[in-house]
A protein has these predicted regions:
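Short beta-edge strand/loop motif at the mouth of beta-sheet-based domains
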Residues: 14, 34-73, 163
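Hydrophobic ligand-binding cavity/cleft-lining segments
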Residues: 1-46
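Generic C-terminal helix-cap and adjacent flexible tail
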Residues: 155-163
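Hydrophobic/aromatic beta-strand elements that line small-molecule binding cavities or substrate pockets
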Residues: 17, 49-52, 74-80, 106-114
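Hydrophobic pocket/interface hotspot
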Residues: 26, 36, 60, 78, ...
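A short, structured loop/turn motif at beta-sheet edges
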Residues: 23-24, 53-55, 79-86, 112-121
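Beta-strand/loop substructures that line and gate deep hydrophobic ligand-binding cavities in soluble
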Residues: 90, 96-144
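Intrinsic-disorder/low-complexity, polar/charged segments enriched in Ser/Thr/Lys/Arg/Asp/Glu/Gln
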Residues: 10-16, 23, 47, 59, ...
Length: 163
């Protein structure tokens, strides 16, 4: 199950996905940079993780390579990390050296994992600072890109024991 909800009043984009596995296995998809690369970008723009320090105060830098070969750089500033349960990051664009691009808006992204005996539910909530920021970022295809990226996790789960 995968659902996407855009709420312009709350300034949020929320993706909910369910997986027939443990929270530990889903968490590994965030904690292991090689696994994150397998689903962190849409199929047409695969992700490459450059730096990966998944702890509060840490940073993750990456880039997605588009079909035309152009690289789109990004960075996360880790705000809070509760392994196997949640993480909160400030997500933004970056330059080729991984330095934040302050000319483009950022979002606060909260990831929550809830495990039951049957499944793990992952909820990703992106919080925008303004309706203008929301319109600008969604105008880049962020919603569809995230839906496609998260939609790849089931295939990763089926082909690796670590995720």
């Amino acid at each position: 199950m995968l659902s996407v909800d855009r709420d312009p009043v709350a300034l949020t984009l929320t993706i909910v996905a369910e997986f027939a596995t443990t929270a530990e296995r889903v968490w590994q998809g965030w904690a292991d940079p090689r696994q994150l690369e397998r689903w962190g970008g849409p199929p047409t723009s695969p992700a490459t993780v450059v730096d990966h320090d998944l702890r509060a105060g840490g940073r993750v830098t990456d880039y997605m390579t588009g079909p035309d070969g152009e690289k789109h750089h990004g960075c996360w500033r880790l705000i809070a990390v509760d392994p196997l349960r949640s993480l909160t990051v400030e997500d933004g664009f970056a330059d080729a050296r991984g330095q934040p691009n302050d000319e483009l808006p950022t979002t606060t992204v909260e990831v929550r994992l809830v495990e039951t005996p049957e499944k793990t539910t992952m909820t990703i909530t992106s919080r925008f600072k303004s309706i203008a920021d929301m319109a600008q970022l969604l105008g880049t295809g962020q919603e569809e890109g995230m839906r496609l990226a998260v939609g790849q996790i089931d295939a990763v789960l089926a082909t690796t024991t670590g995720f």
